[in-house]
Amino acid sequence: MAEEYVPVDPINITPASSKSWLDVDLDTYIASLPPNVTGVAIRVLNASSGGCPAGVRKDGSTDARTTNVTSGQMCFFCGVSSSKIFEIYSGSTTYITAYIVGYFKDVTFLTNATDVSSAKAGVWNDLDSGYNNAIGLILETNIASLKSFDFGFRKNGSTDNRTERGVRRCGCFIIGADAGVSEQYISSTDQDTYLVGYITENATFYTNATDISLGSTGSYADLSVGSASAKANLIEVVASSTYDFGLRRNGASDDLYEGAAKHACILVGADSSGVSEGKIANTVVDFFLLGYFLAAAGAVALAGQIATKSGLAAGTS
């Protein structure tokens, strides 16, 4: 089988209880999943004005990164078990909402993430995953304290220099790699990075990201296309202040519109022409196209939401 990312329009999986790890079964929410599903993409929104605990992990993992996530929205990526189960943690049923926005087939996810934190602050450093065949790395940021630090990720050899502040944890990033090597920047060694998984095919990662920022506010507008064949677009969100933004498949009706976490990475579905839409509350919110995901050879590219099962909640592990 071949690696592939399959986007879906958002499916609400907000936990009904808080402060414990809960099992989520993908088969409960998405019909007719193939047996080679290995991971999931989750959009997490924190509507509080401050931090709130949240986290996701592969079923069976002992990882327990549940420190406060930033106010705003972000993406998390994690593996699923052979039964297509992952686990989610929420510190609040009032402020935290979570949505499945896609799943991965045959992509490698680690049961327990590997610490790939940098020992040097204030400079760009190589981040060697140890997987020479990787063209993209799936990384999770983690700040153990309630402080804010500048950080950034880029493909090895890039001259990009986006090191906007991360206010507490900012979810996961997917970044291009050259023979398994990316680069990271931190302003403090209190900022940790964990390797969650890696990608080897059917994705394109730019060496230098393309600026696809919007010039108008308040309504959804088409974003510049990286490829008409793209099934999903990988977008880095950078903002000098906290303003709302939304990203969705072109033609979709969902409206996950929440504050920019100053620095986030969103994997968003595209229509049959590779187009996604964005909305911003202020032009200080910028979008950068890091790359895009393609259908596996012989696969049928579907624009729009696949068959889902609605009205169901996550169960307690």
Describe the residue ranges of each PLM region.
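A short beta-strand element within beta-rich, extracytoplasmic domains
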Residues: 35-47, 133-144, 230-239, 317
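Extracellular polysaccharide-targeting segments
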Residues: 101-111, 197-212, 293-297
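Surface-exposed loop/edge segments in extracytoplasmic proteins
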Residues: 6, 60-68, 110-112, 158-165, ...
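Beta-sandwich interaction modules
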Residues: 68-82, 164-178, 258-271, 309
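Surface-exposed ligand/attachment interfaces on beta-rich extracellular proteins
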Residues: 8-36, 48-49, 111-132, 206-229, ...
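Edge beta-strands of jelly-roll/beta-sandwich modules across compartments, strongly enriched
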Residues: 51-54, 93-103, 188-199, 282-293
